[in-house]
């Protein structure tokens, strides 16, 4: 907050005056907000985009809605998926026994060493046993490096990673689901996956739709006329930001309602616990600040270039940047100023990337700063 007040003071904008001006020009702001929101509602891009988002997100999330306890004599689903994408609805669960996982990994290494095909090494049983004795007291990483340097056995570490999950029996799957649901409700996990995909879709959608926020106002004749009207910079800028923000919130609320109802349906059918607040909390923390930031970026770009369109490629590149999480010691970290929060991991193992909460606070502060700068730009270009 100290940084915010420093920037505001630097720009010679008194926050008290900002609040006072907003209260004073409340009717003017309401007019701007209503007009902008009506323009959005009349825009077919909003409705077409909403339909596309719902369909795309359903395709991404529908598999999680198939999760259920395996009934007696029920055949476990045999979905054709890559092992790295396999999850509990495909019949795969994490391998919890490290000793068993290590034993299976060593068996895989030994089989490959003794394989006489072009993919194997053609070792005899005695030679393979000798190699296994050499690595038996090493950890997996060290053993993999040893196999690569001494025998040219590359990527042994990936064979161990593939054993992170295994095809579970009905009893194992049910026990795993029951254990996870004793920690959190089904909606707690589903809401995180929903937020993951909703954040991605909303970032792209907001980048496209918000380009219309200033598109009419930045036409030369309209732009010059606006600067001669008795509307203050604070009233205009805040009115436009709020209208764009409310429009995006409306779309987000619709998505929350649709997918909460789907989550509730699955929970009732499968006997899973559900908590309605999970969707609201995740959306509020991990999506709302991103939408606010996108609105503010469009605002300042539109004022600098007198055209909002240059913001679109900038934001698309920013989305790509935000999607590229960094990893350190097997832990995912958010990139600074990301406008999208990801939740890596399988359904019941999902977790928010580290530094996400701090990043969201930074986005809110940055949004306030961008609004203050935008107000200053508007004032300096005003025709008296």
What are these regions (language model features)?
Residues 18-19, 60-112, 116, 177-186, ...:
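Terminal transmembrane helical anchor/hairpin motif
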Residues 210-229:
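Transmembrane helix boundary and interhelical loop/hinge segments in multi-pass membrane proteins
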Residues 83-157:
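N-terminal accessory alpha/beta regions
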Residues 52-101, 145, 154-208, 213, ...:
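Secretory targeting signals
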Residues 25-53, 383:
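Aromatic- and glycine-rich beta-strand/loop motifs that create alpha-glucan
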Residues 39, 216, 264, 303, ...:
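Transmembrane helix-loop junction
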Residues 5-28:
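Short, Lys/Arg-enriched N-terminal segments with co-localized hydrophobic residues
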Residues 232-233:
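Short coil/turn motifs that cap or connect alpha-helices
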């Amino acid at each position: 907050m100290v940084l915010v007040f420093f920037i505001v003071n630097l720009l010679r904008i008194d926050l008290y005056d900002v609040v006072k001006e907003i209260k004073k020009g409340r009717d003017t702001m309401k007019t701007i907000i209503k007009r902008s929101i009506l323009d959005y509602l009349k825009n077919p891009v909003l409705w077409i985009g909403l339909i596309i988002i719902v369909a795309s997100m359903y395709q991404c999330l529908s598999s999680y809605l198939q999760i259920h306890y395996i009934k007696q004599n029920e055949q476990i689903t045999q979905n054709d998926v890559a092992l790295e994408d396999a999850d509990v609805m495909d019949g795969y669960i994490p391998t919890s026994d490290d000793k068993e996982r290590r034993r299976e990994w060593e068996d895989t290494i030994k089989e490959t060493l003794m394989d006489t095909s072009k993919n194997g090494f053609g070792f005899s049983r005695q030679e393979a046993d000798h190699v296994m004795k050499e690595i038996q007291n090493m950890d997996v990483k060290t053993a993999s490096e040893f196999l690569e340097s001494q025998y040219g056995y590359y990527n042994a570490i990936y064979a161990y990673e593939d054993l992170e999950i295994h095809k579970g029996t009905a009893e194992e799957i049910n026990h795993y689901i029951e254990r996870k649901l004793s920690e959190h409700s089904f909606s707690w996990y589903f809401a995180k996956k929903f937020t993951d995909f909703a954040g991605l879709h909303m970032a792209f959608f907001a980048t496209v739709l918000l380009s219309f926020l200033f598109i009419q106002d930045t036409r030369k004749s309209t732009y010059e006329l606006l600067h001669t009207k008795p509307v203050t910079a604070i009233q205009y800028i805040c009115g436009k930001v709020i209208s764009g923000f409310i429009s995006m919130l409306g779309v987000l609320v619709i998505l929350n309602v649709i997918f909460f109802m789907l989550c509730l349906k699955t929970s009732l059918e499968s006997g899973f616990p559900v908590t309605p607040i999970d969707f609201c909390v995740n959306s509020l923390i991990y999506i709302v600040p991103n939408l606010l930031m996108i609105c503010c970026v469009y605002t300042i770009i539109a004022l600098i270039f007198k055209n909002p369109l240059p913001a679109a490629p900038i934001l698309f590149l920013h989305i790509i940047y935000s999607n590229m999480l960094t990893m350190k010691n097997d832990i995912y970290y958010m990139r600074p100023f990301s406008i999208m929060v990801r939740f890596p991991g399988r359904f019941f193992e999902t977790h928010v990337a580290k530094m996400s909460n701090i990043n969201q606070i930074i986005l809110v502060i940055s949004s306030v700063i961008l609004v203050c700068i935008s107000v200053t730009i508007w004032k300096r270009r005003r025709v008296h």
